[in-house]
Amino acid sequence: WFGMDDFAPKVRHAYMNAVSKLYRDCFCRKIGDWCRAHGVMYIGHIIEDMNSHARLGCSAGHYFRSLDGQDMSGMDIVLHQVMPGMESIIHTSSCAGNNSDGEFYNYILAKLASSMAHLKPEMKGRAMCEVFGAYGWAESATFMKWLIDFLLVRGVNNFVPHAFSPIYPNPDCPPHFGAEGHDPQFEGFKTLMRYTNK
């Protein structure tokens, strides 16, 4: 973008408005209509890492429009984005930029998902989070319970654990639950899932 005095913000706003509406109408709603016509729920999330939910290129430019057409709102918590006691500081993370904006992940992201789930009647109050990914093998069942509770009190009520991998070892964003018997915390994970399903 080149500076054009007071005109540049107006152009940027009009561009983002037009592109994010086209994304909603020509992508999300089309996929959602196809899924429902074939008896499949359309769920997922966009890239929210490092506040990219409001940017084009790395994400869709508008959180609410980008999920319009889905049967649940969606988000993910990965890469040490949420850590106890780190909510008010930017801390190191293994995501793009090598740091994590604790305020966004602790106070905003889950509320975006739960708000959308309540604003869109067709979502029936369902807010989904892909959770536990890329915290590494040191992520304990105790921390996972803390993370589930953290999300529940913010209105997230459906969870997709990351990840169950058919191969071990798999370098993609551990932990991997089960891990062909190599995950010593798998018994704790089963207990956690029973807790979460209540």
Protein language model regions, located:
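Carbohydrate-binding surfaces of carbohydrate-active enzymes
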Residues: 1-198
